Each structure stands twice: as C-alpha cells, then as structure tokens.
UniProtKB/Swiss-Prot annotation:
The active site is at residues 380, 515, 517. It comes from Nitrobacter winogradskyi (strain ATCC 25391 / DSM 10237 / CIP 104748 / NCIMB 11846 / Nb-255). CTP binds at residues 13, 146-148, 186-191, 222. Belongs to the CTP synthase family. Allosterically activated by GTP, when glutamine is the substrate; GTP has no effect on the reaction when ammonia is the substrate. The allosteric effector GTP functions by stabilizing the protein conformation that binds the tetrahedral intermediate(s) formed during glutamine hydrolysis. Inhibited by the product CTP, via allosteric rather than competitive inhibition. PANTHER family: CTP SYNTHASE, CTP SYNTHASE-RELATED. CTPSs have evolved a hybrid strategy for distinguishing between UTP and CTP. The overlapping regions of the product feedback inhibitory and substrate sites recognize a common feature in both compounds, the triphosphate moiety. To differentiate isosteric substrate and product pyrimidine rings, an additional pocket far from the expected kinase/ligase catalytic site, specifically recognizes the cytosine and ribose portions of the product inhibitor. SUPFAM superfamilies: Class I glutamine amidotransferase-like, P-loop containing nucleoside triphosphate hydrolases. This is CTP synthase. Its EC number is 6.3.4.2. Catalyzes the ATP-dependent amination of UTP to CTP with either L-glutamine or ammonia as the source of nitrogen. Regulates intracellular CTP levels through interactions with the four ribonucleotide triphosphates.
Length: 543
C-alpha cells in the first residue's frame, strides 16, 4: 500500500514547494522506491490554460493533453516519470465534477456541502491509481491560511486518519528570514505558520526551512520546541547554486532519512546520487560558454518559459558549456534595427506565444538569423513567424501573415478546424471556447529521410512530441516555400499539418510546431536542444 507525503507551504508564496517535492521524489527514487507526484491547486480555474503567463507562469502540457501547473515540469525533470492529467487538479475541476453529478441526481437530493462532498472528492483524487507506488507526494498549492486552500487542508487532515497508522506524514516548507540589523535568523514567522496549521488539525512531522545560511543549534532547538517537532526533523533547506543541486543539498541535510524515519522505515542503503553529482560537476565546471537570445513576449516573467530555460540548460550539460541567456522583448524590434541586439549572440530562440503584440519583432529576428547564418530555433509561434518571414522576403508574398492577427489576403498561418487524434477526428471553430480547445498533448510526426532534423533524432522517421497550439502553417504555400529553400521536413502522418521546417544551406535553422522543451530532462537532454547548443558552440568560435 502506498504511503503519502503531503507538502504544504507557509510564511510566503514562491518558496519552491514544487522543487522541494520533486527533489524529495528524486531522493526516494534514488533509494529504489517507486514514487508518484501530484499537485493540488486551490484556484477556481478549471486549469491554467487560459490564465495569463504573467500571473501563473508556464502552462505545462502532458502527453495526454492536460494543461497543468509548471510544477509538474519539475516532477518530470527530476524523476523522469511522465505526468498525466490525473496528477493535477484544481478547485474548479472539483466543483465542476460535483455540480455535474448533482445535476444528474447522483447525490439523491442531499444538500451539497464543502464537508463532506468537496473534501471527499479531493480525497478520492489523492487516493486514485496509487496501488503500484511506494510513495505518493502531494503538493498543496498556495500557503497555509489562504481561504481557497481550506478544503484541501481539511481533506489531507481527514486522510491521515482514514489511512492505516503510519501511512501519511506532513512536510511543511517555510522561510527563516535573516534580519541584517539583528544579525540573526528569525523563527517567529515559522512558528506562526505552524500555529495556523495546527489550528486546522494538522501537526507537521517535518519542517523544511528555506534559508541562505546555517541554522544555529539554538534556533533549531527553538523551532523543535515551539513547533512540536523533533529537533532532527528541522531540516535546513539551504539555497543551492542551481536547482539540480537541490537533491544533494537536501540529502546532506537529512531530509530523506527523516522522511523514512517518520514512516518507521529503516534505510537499507544510501541513495544512488552519482548521476546528480555528475550533472552538477558539468554545470559548475563548464568547458566554455555560449549566449542565446530569447526573443519573446513574456520576458518580464521568466517562469512563463520555465521548461525552455531548463531545456537550454540541459543542452549546455550535454555539450559541457554554460548557457547564458539574453532576454529580449520582441516589441523592441518593431521600430528598431535587430542587428545591435543580436550581433553578439551565438544563437537565437523564438519561443511560443499568442497574439499580434511583438510578432513583427520575432519576424525580424528570424530574418536576421537567416541572413547572418546565426543558429535559429523557432518553437510553435517561433516556427510560424519564420515561415511568414520566408514568404515575405524570399518568395515575395509581401502580405503574408497569420489569421490570428486578423483578416489577410495571404494566410500563411491559419486556424486549425480539424485534426486527427489517433483514429478520431477532432473539430474546432473560431466561435468555440478558448479553454481546452487547442491541439494539446502528444502527436506523431513523420520526418523526411536525409533531413537535418531526422539526423538530430538519430535517423528516426517517426517521432512523438507534445503540442499546444490552435494555428498551423498553411500547406497551400508549401511548394512555393520549398522552391526558395525552406524545407518542410516533418509533417503529421496524414500529411496535412506541417510540424518541422528547416533550411539545409544554413548552419542551423529549424522551426518546430511542437514544444520539445516539455520532454527534456537533465539526464536525457532533448536532441534538438543538445544540437542547437552544439551549433551555438560552433558559432561562438566564429563571432
């Protein structure tokens, strides 16, 4: 039977509960246990698919097409286990399910209440499908005290009593701020956070204390005394120089040992952390450096590109180089020459996005990369802008544009109205809802033999990658574009939807309609990112 670890947060938001959960999952996995990680989000949205990147950050898409919290990206990258739509739930989804069942009459006329109906739905989600796992780690979004989170805290309180004794523990992530004028770490915010938890019936078993310095023995004793935890269960979560050092840092602090002790499990052997050690050696001792320009729309909110940042880091690990990122707001190119911003970089990446704002700047970035022979990687929207650039400046279609921006006489990019998922036809219309209506999740693509991209994928002729888009390049222009050197080297199996474009007479210029960053791992860098950084290394020797 699975054992459950509930991770909560206190004092302030953005402490890194997702990263802490992922690191703990990796440590347990390194000891030979089978783990599953799940995220419970208290907001009322059904999913983050229609939320602003500035508020929520990245939307992480799973193979089965779920739009989920970015923490699921951490879970996948640290454990290598693909997440599914069953690993993330929101208050909105729970309420939708309950109200649907109420309308059907499933509750037989009962008054629907937060307790027991909402809490029972949360518990059912947590317990579902865990039979073949040793540990299930459940992260509760937000911080203790948030009114939205109360049903979730109540549900996990009940679960500890529902499960057999010794099958559930609570890990509380908190902050120990250092006050320079006093010259000491302050424990009072943590004490109040734990007091809030205890007031709703939850006694933490382990305190995971974020800090930038060592916790003095006296402060550790004070936390143990006033928070009612063992002194050994006050874990020092020191800041790390990079996120892939966190598993080693937490192991050195004793987190995994304390978790096993809380369950009454005697550790058989220390965790196998050599792989993590090797990765950190590569990160800390690079053999060179490259600079990649990210020409985007949401550059003020780096979390909007979380998986992208990590995938570029993985490309650096694969090539033993440090990857420096130069964030450039694409709007600056609309009235400025791109050259002064891009002449110093070793590669240009234009990521996914939506809407017209900044689109012309991305088109200029693609043109600069094509004409100056700088490695270019266009992802989703970045591929579409590269195709429009080619149509305008190579083929001579001056009005080439996307219907996403409004009516156009030359729709190089248009709204998808139907596509195949397996053997089933999916249809969409412009008048439909925004949420959950894109082409989402894993789809196959067929690669042309002899193409650059096929070589990057090890000679593969069929791949599967994750998608998140509702617009697609118009194949009616395919022949004219190919006559001018832009090769369509990847298509959907039915040949209808372009998936990959490339210039073969360019050092490295590839656009993909999918999101390869979602499948990159530190131990298995995505081949496109490894190849892109390799091309940037070559470029760095030419600049």
């Amino acid at each position: 039977m699975a054992r459950y670890i509930f991770i909560t947060g206190g004092v302030v938001s953005s402490l890194g509960k997702g990263l802490a959960s992922a690191a703990l999952g990796a440590l347990l996995q390194a000891r030979g246990y089978k783990v599953r990680l799940r995220k419970l989000d208290p907001y009322l949205n059904l999913d983050p698919g229609t939320m602003s990147p500035y508020q929520h950050g990245e939307v992480f898409v799973t193979d089965d097409g779920a739009e989920t919290d970015l923490d699921l990206g951490h879970y996948e990258r640290f454990t290598g286990r693909p997440a599914t739509r069953q690993d993330n739930i929101t208050t909105g989804r729970i309420y939708q399910d309950i109200l649907t069942r109420e309308r059907r009459g499933d509750y037989l006329g009962a008054t629907i209440q937060v307790i027991p109906h909402v809490t029972n739905a949360i518990k059912a989600f947590i317990l579902d499908g865990n039979d073949d796992h040793d540990f299930v780690l459940c992260e509760i979004g937000g911080t203790v005290g948030d009114i939205e989170g109360l049903p979730f805290f109540e549900a996990i309180r009940q679960l500890k009593n529902d499960l057999p004794r010794g099958h559930a523990i609570y890990v509380h992530l908190t902050l120990l701020p250092f006050i320079p004028s006093a010259g000491e770490l302050k424990t009072k915010p943590t004490q109040h956070s734990v007091k809030e938890l205890r007031s709703i019936g939850i006694q933490p078993d382990i305190l995971l204390c974020r800090t930038d310095r060592e916790i003095p023995a006296e402060e550790r004793r004070k936390l143990g005394l006033f928070c009612n935890v063992r002194e050994s269960a006050v874990i020092e979560a020191r800041d790390a120089d990079n996120i892939y050092a966190v598993p080693e840092v937490y192991h050195a602090a004793g987190l995994d040992d304390e978790v096993l002790a809380a369950f009454g499990i005697e550790p058989a052997a220390p965790p196998a952390l050599k792989g993590w050690h090797d990765i950190n050696e590569r990160i800390r001792n690079p053999e060179g450096a490259v600079t990649i320009a990210i020409v985007g729309k949401y550059t003020g909110m780096k979390d909007a590109y979380k998986s992208l940042i990590e995938a570029l880091s993985h490309g650096g690990i694969a090539n033993k180089v440090k990857v420096n990122l130069d964030w450039i707001e694409s709007e600056v190119f609309e009235n400025e020459d791109a050259a002064p911003f891009l002449e110093h970089v070793d590669g240009i990446l234009v990521p996914g996005g939506f809407g017209q704002r900044g689109a012309e700047g991305k088109i200029k970035a693609a043109r600069f990369a094509r004409e100056r022979h700088v490695p270019y990687f266009g992802i989703c929207f970045g591929m579409q802008m590269a195709v429009i650039e080619a149509a305008r400046n190579l083929v001579g279609i001056s009005d080439a544009n996307s219907t996403e921006f409004g009516p156009t006489r030359e729709p190089l990019v248009g709204l998808m109205t139907e596509w195949l998922r397996g053997s089933e036809l999916e249809k969409r219309s412009k008048a439909g809802d925004l949420g959950g209506t894109m082409r989402l999740g894993a789809y196959p693509a067929m690669l042309k033999r002899g193409s650059r991209v096929s070589g990057i994928y090890g000679g593969a002729v069929e791949i599967s990658e994750r998608h998140r888009h509702r617009y697609e390049v118009n194949t009616a222009y395919k022949d004219r574009l190919e006559q001018h050197g832009l090769r369509f080297s990847g298509l959907s199996p039915d040949g209808v939807l372009p998936e990959i474009v490339e210039y073969q007479d360019h050092p490295w210029f590839i656009g993909v309609q999918y999101h390869p960053e979602l499948k990159s791992r530190p131990f298995e860098p995505h081949p496109l990112f490894a190849s892109f950084i390799q091309a940037a290394v070559v470029q760095s020797r030419l600049v």
